[in-house]
Amino acid sequence: PSLKIARGLSTARLREKIAEVQRINQSLAGTRLLCGAEVDIKNDGTLDYPDDLLRRLDLVIGAIHSGFKQGREQITNRIITAMHNPLVHIIAHPTGRLIGEREPYDVDMACVIEAASRTGTALEINAYKDRLDLDDAAAREAGKKGVMLAIGTDSHHLEQLWMMELGVTVARRGWLESRHMLNTLSAEELLAWTQARRQRMQA
């Protein structure tokens, strides 16, 4: 909710969103609408919504949207701290780059990938044309470490969904296969994966 520029939802509005999705699901036959949120990773690695609210979401994506000038150790530990939260499933746009506009922040991607492997946290290949983050080299290293990846378009309009093609291209350039990608799972398989990760981190 602290990220106003991206129309971040207040806790009250997120609760309303969850309730709305539940109402929709009650009216659907044979289809389930999942409810998730991209949640700001604060400077200390904690999340911008309370745990009791995050537990009600099917999918939680952690992302850094501020504090880009933190030192290498601090920003790396910030991401890894978020990974150790059992309620976080995916880390979005892990390097924060905006092509031609902003350099990646000074993060130790080898350490992040290793932590993702240990914690079972997935990493995003953000397919937005100005991000392409992870890039193909980092995506390949993640896949080699057994890390699951998720392609997201960062779309704010239907017309931007075509950028999924760019994300698929990054994954292919990284020699990734369907077995590496959360996108290839059925809804049931995805929910089983999220539950398994949560149980693993709470053990």
Show the residue positions of the predicted features:
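Charged catalytic cores and adjacent phosphate/nucleic-acid-binding surfaces used
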Residues: P1-R32, I41-A203
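Two-metal-ion RNase H-like nuclease active-site motif
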Residues: E38
